[in-house]
Amino acid sequence: MKRVTFVAADLSTGGGVNKVIRDLAVLFKQTLGADVTVVNARSDRPSTYRFPSDVPVPQHRRQSLLSYFRLLLRLRKASPDFVTSSWTQDNILVVLAFLFSRTKTIVVEHSSWHFHSWAIRLLRRIVYPLASSVVVLNRRDLDHYRAYLSDVRLIPDPVTVPSLPPEQREKLIIAVGHLSPLKNFEDAIRAMAMSGLEKDGWSLAIIGSGRSEPDLRGLVEELGLTRTRLHPSQVDLASWYARASLLLVTSRLESFSLVLAEAMLSGVVPIAYASDGPSFILEDFPEHLVKLGDVDALARRLVRFASGPDAEPLRRALRASIQSRFAPDIVVEQWRELLEAPCR
């Protein structure tokens, strides 16, 4: 039985990456028969996403960088067969901590290659070749890392949503994520205003929390929108997916976009800025991609899909695309191939 250690920074913060860590840990345990431990390395608060009882999740208090590295060295002494991490800075430290050990290091890059500062990119350029494998989530990142890595693989996130009884689709547009400048919800609000869809009974719900909330609320008021509202973050988005007709993804950077894939699986029609992740997920649906920052085009696309003909054939095609590429049983087999590959 292979022993796999997942290193997570802070499982209490929610978000797509932590959900993927939980889902992969469960898949490794239940499908691959691995002995899995998930280390909550920099938080002693409970995980947002529940883990089964047979997957231990040891907690560690938030600590200095030096103490964190010492923790990684202690994990090294346990000699797992594989260790995997998911954030760039953590990836760098994990590779260094396990260097020259018998443990195979697999780092998953959840940030687009051009996201970080030059200093972090330089460290990554030096350290990532020392990892056993690097996993990326879209084709553009794959092309970038192939230039200097001998073992880089495209393995997307597994995508699932709870099954709910079908509901009548509402005149509802949703946008989901942390309320930060990077997620760029200002463009979603401006596109809603430019589209004029509120006068036809359409609503925009922005679901999330973060420091941009006051500015976003101010923009809604400034533009005179009465059917556009902000809602608190929610762990389970299934009920929103079941009701919504359209999804807006306006992030400046996305290496994958779990929300986009989950919404498509639920039959929500997406409109997304063409950053790396959405471009990969929607590669068979280019008409749903909009040039970054083009709010006029975003508004026009909203009107087009809000007023289009029966969307059920499109919804079925969107679901089928996600099921055929990102279903857990497909993704876990790609991981099985990686775990069973000869060690470097």
Predicted regions and their residues:
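N-terminal strand-loop element at the rim of the active site
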Residues: 7-66, 144
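A conserved mid-protein helix/loop that constitutes part of the nucleotide-sugar donor-binding site
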Residues: 15-23, 171, 178-194, 204, ...
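Carbohydrate-associated surface elements
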Residues: 140, 158
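A charged, aromatic-enriched C-terminal amphipathic alpha-helix characteristic of glycosyltransferases
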Residues: 163, 309-340
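Aromatic "clamp/platform" in nucleotide-sugar-dependent glycosyltransferases that forms part
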Residues: 233, 252
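Short hydrophobic beta-strand element within catalytic cores of glycosyltransferases
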Residues: 269-272
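Conserved acidic donor-binding segment of nucleotide-sugar-dependent glycosyltransferases
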Residues: 274, 284-296, 303-309
